[in-house]
């Protein structure tokens, strides 16, 4: 299990970092600089609003399907037609509910028009997620990794031509950015569908009432978790746009810091997506997933912590590098969001363990509590602190959810890290931040200071044994280990 995970996650990280880094820094950032804060802020708020009700598109079906197929790949043929029928019905519900709320909130005609395209994109993105859950469940992990970045590759090509191809005579429009996403999602959805039909042996679509009932009942716990996490992940920008004066501009300023946070958060998401089918297959065969979880935690949390603390030390300099004119409050919110990356990483390790072990009732209670806390804190802190209040809320919510997930895993399954290990990790992050604080005051350039801080962070991670590259290399090259792993899998 560990060798399979290590090889696949290294491939996924390499591909994703190359593609998504160019997307965030080359395309997304350029679009915001070109169209301006108000236009991008309106898009960002509407995009976040379109995400809020995506629970209705999935209702936990992708998570349930991934776990079910990973345990028994032949279930692809059994579930495919039934899930497809459910998704079509859920799509209608998603459009009705989202548009009803949009009209109730007083969205204007041009906002609704833009929202409709964004909603179509969410439908296709959700469909891709479900199709990929079949592919990863069947253990085609490298293929799933390629599909995970295929949409961004297509968006880069389309937006690159529009931005730098000399065909946008009157300037780039935010609507083109949205339509490029539509083209990308449609292409990847068709490719993913063809793969699932062929590799899964799906000959025809034949819904079955009993199977439908089983899917709905078992998918509801996933739905509660997905809904709660979606709300406390995306509600902030919607509330910023609604609660603050010049809300669209404020949402655009918040997006400046949130963009990098969202991009870095994809790393824990990738870890969770890769871990779930492997852990599920391991548990179904009676294997111990603790060694895999410990290795994944070391691989994720050490570099994530080092990078996040370094970025949080130089927030103004990083935003100045990325944007023509960082907005008011963007620096403070960016610093807080970078610190938030660490508990996000913890959540995706521990929540994946709970999901693989079918501890969804506990996970649902944790995430729903986090959602309620997040909404209340946002309503209080955004009017008081502005966009920094939303970032502060994110830090508090994610930290408490992370702690709750750790406690739940320790009490119901097994412990990954003891109190001493946790204390060492916090001490390592504190020392890295202290090193950066000192380096800022030496008078050297901020890039040199950041590079030295990163070096100090890597040295501390090695010293505290939070990363062990030689051990990982031996695991990859040890063929005997590979054979033993395959025998267990």
Question: Predicted regions span which residues?
Answer:
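Membrane-proximal transmembrane or re-entrant/amphipathic helices at the cytosolic face
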Residues: 436-489
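Hydrophobic alpha-helical transmembrane segments
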Residues: 112, 116-119, 145-198, 369-374, ...
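Helix-terminus/linker motif at the lipid-water interface of multi-pass membrane proteins
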Residues: 22-39, 166, 227-263, 278-281, ...
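Interhelical loop/hinge segments that connect adjacent transmembrane helices in multipass membrane
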Residues: 1-6, 170-178, 190-233, 274, ...
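N-terminal membrane topogenesis motif
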Residues: 1-24, 77, 81, 209-225, ...
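Helix-loop junctions and terminal segments of transmembrane helices
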Residues: 24, 29, 57-74, 137, ...
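Alpha-helical transmembrane segments of multi-pass membrane transport and lipid-handling proteins
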Residues: 22, 57, 81-108, 157, ...
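Signature of the first transmembrane helix
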Residues: 4-62, 95, 99, 121-122, ...
């Amino acid at each position: 299990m560990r060798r399979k995970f290590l090889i696949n996650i290294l491939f996924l990280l390499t591909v994703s970092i190359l593609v998504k880094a160019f997307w965030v820094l080359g395309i997304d950032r350029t679009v915001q600089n070109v169209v301006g804060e108000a236009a991008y802020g309106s898009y960002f708020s509407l995009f976040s609003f379109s995400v809020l009700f995506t629970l209705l598109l999935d209702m936990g079906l992708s998570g349930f399907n991934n776990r079910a197929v990973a345990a028994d790949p032949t279930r692809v043929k059994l579930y495919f037609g039934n899930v497809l029928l459910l998704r079509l019905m859920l799509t209608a519900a998603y459009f009705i509910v989202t548009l009803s709320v949009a009209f109730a909130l007083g969205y204007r005609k041009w906002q609704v028009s833009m929202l409709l395209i964004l909603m179509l994109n969410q439908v296709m993105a959700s469909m891709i997620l479900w199709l990929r859950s079949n592919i990863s469940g069947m253990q085609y992990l490298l293929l799933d990794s390629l599909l995970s970045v295929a949409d961004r590759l297509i968006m880069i090509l389309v937006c690159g031509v529009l931005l730098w191809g000399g065909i946008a005579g009157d300037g780039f429009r935010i609507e083109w950015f949205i339509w490029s996403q539509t083209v990308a999602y449609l292409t990847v959805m068709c490719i993913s569908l063809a793969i699932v039909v062929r590799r899964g042996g799906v000959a025809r679509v034949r819904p079955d009432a009993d199977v439908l009932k089983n899917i709905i009942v078992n998918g509801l716990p996933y739905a509660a978790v997905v809904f709660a996490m979606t709300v406390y992940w995306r509600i902030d920008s919607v509330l910023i746009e609604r609660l603050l004066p010049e809300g669209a501009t404020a949402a655009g300023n918040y997006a400046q810091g949130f963009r990098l946070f969202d991009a870095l958060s994809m790393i824990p998401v990738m870890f969770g997506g890769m871990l779930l089918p492997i852990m599920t297959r391991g548990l179904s065969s009676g294997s111990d997933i603790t060694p895999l979880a410990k290795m994944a935690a070391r691989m994720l949390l050490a570099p994530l912590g080092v990078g996040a603390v370094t970025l949080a030390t130089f927030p103004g300099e990083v935003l100045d590098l990325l944007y023509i004119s960082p907005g008011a409050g963007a620096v403070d919110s960016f610093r807080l969001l970078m610190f938030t990356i660490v508990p996000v990483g913890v959540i995706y390790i521990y929540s994946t363990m709970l999901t693989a072990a079918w501890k969804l009732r506990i996970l649902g209670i944790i995430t729903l509590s986090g959602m309620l806390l997040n909404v209340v804190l946002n309503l209080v802190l955004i009017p008081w602190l502005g966009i920094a209040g939303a970032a502060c809320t994110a830090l508090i919510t994610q930290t408490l959810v992370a702690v709750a997930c750790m406690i739940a895993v320790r009490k119901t399954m097994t412990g990954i890290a003891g109190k001493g290990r946790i204390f060492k990790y916090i001490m390592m992050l504190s020392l890295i931040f202290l090193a950066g604080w000192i380096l800022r005051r030496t008078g050297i350039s901020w890039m040199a200071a950041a590079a030295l801080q990163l070096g100090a962070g890597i040295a501390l991670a090695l010293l505290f044994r939070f990363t062990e590259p030689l051990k990982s290399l031996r695991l990859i090259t040890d063929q005997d280990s590979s054979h033993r792993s395959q025998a267990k899998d």
